[in-house]
Amino acid sequence: MERQVHPHASMLTLQFPLVGCRFCLHRLVWKWIKRVMTCSLATLLCAAEPQLLQPVGGTQDGGLARVLSVMDKEAIERFEPDTEVVFHMFNDLLRAYTHQDNVKDAWNVFIKPEDIVGIKVLSDPGSVSGTRPAVVEAVIKSLLSVGFSGRQIIIWDRRKGLLVATGYDQLAKRLGVSIAGSVDYGFDQAVYYEAPLVGNLVFGDHEFGRDEPGIGRKSYVSKLLTQKLTRVIQIHPMLNHYLGGVNGHVVGLATGGVDNSLRFTLDEDRYHEAIPEICAIPALYDKLAFSLVDALISQYQGEERGFLQYSTVLGELRISKDPVALDVLSMMEINRQRNQSGLKRHRSAFQLYRNAELLQLGVSDPSNILFERIR
């Protein structure tokens, strides 16, 4: 395949040291960053959409992010995935991404035999618009097929009850794995993100019901991540999000891994700063094996509610070690669909991914993303 890199505006490269578990970049720094940026990332991404969404070859090289895609028109029929087709799609994608001839060697690139693997899903929107159980089943069956123990696999999201409502408890029982809610697992008092923004604590938050000075300023990381899981695989759908642009991997890992995150939704700028900073906590980001986009169906309107009338069947899966690049490409596709439907594009949310790149979480500049479709 021919390799293409899209020559748009150059990338501003800034690095920030991450110290401990308090990743609070001062607002003055962010304002300075925004002033010195010479181009609008939103404009850049909108301009790059038509070319970047075409099949492109490429390999990970230097500061470039590598994203692989597989499509199959037989993967979904009347909004129902074909589990066998999806299983083969994933295995083909995994082998191609790792440049391995067999599935076992491909998994060995990411997972060690002793790892406890957490598969992060989005269950709030249900099994049609959220992470589809057929995709999760494909990943788990692939792991089991190479001898990995089901006792070392946990399907997780914020709340166990939502996993049950979406049918993940039955899937877990059938495959011999388990499910867990990060909120239900409890929170680690020693690992947290602190910001001087106080919101209303809700039931399930670690400090809920307490009335002391300083309460509500910390977002604690779940013990599921600090004490149980050693590797995380994220599987999120291509679903729009009104603050984050896409309910993808950066937003999903940050909001799924900590409590007291609703306070950031009150201010767009603060949300765009806090979400990448939370995602950068080592107990979250450092455990990522890879991220997978469930793009069997793309929903461009509705956020956590399922609206098939605002959905497009793509029959596609995408994989990368770079969650930021995946989210940027998903946002671009969602914006393309919104534009075709006469809806306003998400523009301001691109700042979230620019901030994530400044924290070295991934690549947000489309000229540094190599996108390859294997079929």
Explain the meaning of each model-derived region:
Residues 43-46, 339:
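Hydrophobic alpha-helical membrane context
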